[in-house]
Amino acid sequence: MAGENSDNEPSSPASPSSAGFNTDQLPISTSQNSENFSDEEEAAVDTQVIRDEPDEAEDEEEEEGEDLFNDTFMNDYRKMDENDQYESNGIDDSVDDERDLGQAMLDRRAADADLDARENRLANRKLPHLLHDNDSDDWNYRPSKRSRTTVPPRGNGGDPDGNPPSSPGVSQPDISMTDQTDDYQDEDDNDDEAEFEMYRIQGTLREWVMRDEVRRFIAKKFKDFLLTYVKPKNENGDIEYVRLINEMVSANKCSLEIDYKEFIHVHPNIAIWLADAPQPVLEVMEEVSEKVIFDLHPNYKNIHTKIYVRVTNLPVNDQIRNIRQIHLNTMIRIGGVVTRRSGVFPQLQQVKYDCNKCGAVLGPFFQNSYSEVKVGSCSECQSKGPFTVNVEQTIYRNYQKLTIQESPGTVPAGRLPRHKEVILLNDLIDCARPGEEIEVTGIYTNNFDLSLNTKNGFPVFATVVEANYVTKKQDLFSAYKLTQEDKTQIEELSKDPRIVERIIKSIAPSIYGHEDIKTALALAMFGGQEKNIKGKHRLRGDINVLLLGDPGTAKSQFLKYVEKTGQRAVYTTGKGASAVGLTAAVHKDPVTREWTLEGGALVLADRGICLIDEFDKMNDQDRVSIHEAMEQQSISISKAGIVTSLQARCSVIAAANPVGGRYDSSKSFAQNVELTDPILSRFDILCVVKDVVDPVTDEMLAEFVVNSHFKSQPKGGKMEDSDPEDGIQGSSGSTDPEVLPQNLLKKYLTYSKLYVFPKLGELDAKKLETVYANLRRESMNGQGVSIATRHLESMIRMSEAHARMHLRQYVTEEDVNMAIRVLLDSFISTQKFGVQRTLRESFKRYITYKKDFNSLLLVLLKELVKNALKFEEIISGSNSGLPTIEVKIEELQTKAKEYDIADLRPFFSSTDFSKAHFELDHGRGMIKCPKRLITW
């Protein structure tokens, strides 16, 4: 039988292939003939294949079943006329179509064209070309598989670029979208309907953004954003992020900051995806950023192989105590104070393993924060271990953990502050220190913690925040935040000859008067120039200030103002701070159980300002502990086996009350304060504030305070629509245009510390030497603060600080005169009342330098009025009959010349003159004042 079948032709009617069966299931000899084999060889093959005679063992095992391919299987296809009869009921072979064959073919082609058009419309509606995928499992949207004649659009079955022609039912853009040679190819920008379909999320958002076509869509939009975005207020039309990329490269950084508010304005849907599914979206954005940056700067990849995208200005600011399960795997923004910081540890990023049995190197395996790498078996020897990490070929990344606690001002009354752990990676390492208040933008994730399960008795996941962007609240006006427009504005402002007076007026504008304190605080905030002679002898450049005076003279308010305005200002009180609280403490870390150092207020204020209120209430032991910090600006520690030195390079501004509550000018300075000479000599400026009863000054002060309260009300006065960003905290700012906005003052202060380093000249040094020698001679006669060498250094520091206010790189005579004036005011204010007058006469040419002459002339005029009253009382025995008191202008001019004041016209037109109820009579050359208004 086999030989007969093998002799038949494949096309014979009796062959299975002619009957329409699949010849792959038949023996080779029955499906096709080979010209290379003879009949004997073919028969031999047939004997082995077709004549399959089973063994007896197989018959016993397979008793059931039938061999379909036996010797007689072809009999199933023989012709049987009696059985090959079909019913004719219901079957009509007649054709009613009267068309000819040609017309029928034309109609068939037209019907096929209609079907093709219908399928294209359905495909565009349900699944646009942008989402076509050859590997899609959705049969509802699978293109039609009916075999129709498809004519290629171009010759040779392809396009000019050499791409293969489209398969039937699949458009050419579909093939280009699934081409894996280019991850992110640009699509048709005019395909609005396809872009609309990209926002129709199918399934969960995380799964949606991980699809290849969606990743390509996000990459395209983000690349366009980086290369085309222009700020609305940018008149030059500069591309914002190209400029930021150039600044990032020039600063040798690897983090590109993206403003979320700008991004959501251009691409709102993708920005929402970034907030709700940040991990996959950030991966795409970082890949695009690397490609864009390395295209603009090809050699930068030799410096940084990885670019990180940092998201700034996330609009939602969550509280730590309000974070819930709904925030998991989303981007959040929280704030708090850093309470603990771990060391820097290496974390696996790209790991390779060695098989201990065969020595094969397995990997690389990529480790991330969301999954753990586990090797199942060796690909070489198929063993299941053991495996060891290949240290040489494994790549690590930096890892650090912070613990932040809710800020004291945000904790509800009666509640304990909550805390949360923050993970820092890569270039975010050491971006914050304990004690600093920071804001963290990151991904809220969870990890398995076995200790929590053991403690709670049921499965619990520990939650952490993987930081993406960290900013300090004190660094809002740091160097990289100063734009070119800010720098230009600051440089123009420094050309104002009255810039120092404007800065002093801008210090605590809500506090009336106290020009000497405001001048001292301004000098301390700008600071002098630090010197380190050949790395052996270091001289501090920070200026220390002590405010000593009666209660109610706004000493604490000045400190609070400096805390908000100064850079890295730390506020503490003398009674609430111990010695270790000011310097440093040694304690055991609760995690590692090792002795660690925790810095105090002076350490946390490094390169800033430390503010100490109630300085006189400190214990003597605690006060002695800051001696080293105030002069050498370092803190030495030798405790628990830790011998080290911490940096405390900061200005100290302290406030204290005199003995008995009020300052008595009839007593010496040592009798008024309980501070020793070693601590007093470390203060560069001493400001003695006395609450003196003066009806004119008191009336002006009362008017200022009342107006300040009235105009600060939500619906009171004319300041209802005032801008709070101007930082004007009182009524003085509304009438005085010379007061600088507080934001501008902060930027001016930052700019001066970054770019201005003044130097002292030889002529100025000689002048300082002369004044110092005279002060030493006068201090031996008085009972105030003794003048030491430190005060000479203080004058140098104040000269440099005054030069910084003008943004000058050198010290001029004007700066030296200002420093001498401030030091003389400080020295004279500590003397007894009788000695003060003598010293003012001796140094009056320095004391009156650049002082507000109006207040000085007002004091001189009041003295002349008092003398006139006394003279009239002596002559006539009584002054009750005088309606007004008159003083000659010549007498005031004579007094003013003693203080080198020649022009009195500004004083006569000032508000101080009019508010004191004085009237000017030019015709008679007299100054009149009603006697009934004289209360001094």
From Swiss-Prot:
User: What does the tissue specificity note say?
Assistant: Expressed in root apical meristem, lateral root meristem primordia, leaf primordia, shoot apical meristem and flower buds.
List where Acidic residues composition bias occurs. 53-69, 180-190
Regions of compositional bias (Low complexity) in chain numbering: 10-19
Q: Spell out the InterPro entries in the cross-references.
A: MCM, MCM2, MCM_CS, MCM_dom, MCM_lid, MCM_N, MCM_OB, NA-bd_OB-fold
Q: Write out the GO biological process terms.
A: cell cycle DNA replication; DNA replication initiation; embryo development ending in seed dormancy; regulation of cell population proliferation; regulation of root meristem growth; root development
Stretches the record annotates as Disordered = 1-105, 126-190, 711-739
Q: Which residues bind ATP?
A: 549-556
What EC number(s) would the UniProt record show? Answer: 3.6.4.12
- Enzyme class, first EC level, given as a word: hydrolase
Q: Which GO terms describe its molecular function?
A: ATP binding; ATP hydrolysis activity; DNA binding; helicase activity; zinc ion binding
Q: Name one GO cellular component term.
A: THO complex
Q: Where is this motif: Arginine finger?
A: 681-684
Q: In which broad location class does this protein mainly occur, judging by the first location in its UniProt entry?
A: nucleus
Q: Which reaction does it catalyse?
A: ATP + H2O = ADP + phosphate + H(+)
Q: What happens when the gene is disrupted?
A: Embryonic lethality when homozygous.
Top-rank taxon, per record: Eukaryota
Family designation? Belongs to the MCM family.
Which miscellaneous remark does the UniProt record hold?
Answer: Over-expression of MCM2 strongly reduces plant and cell sizes and inhibits endoreduplication.
* Name the record gives this protein: DNA replication licensing factor MCM2
- The organism is Arabidopsis thaliana
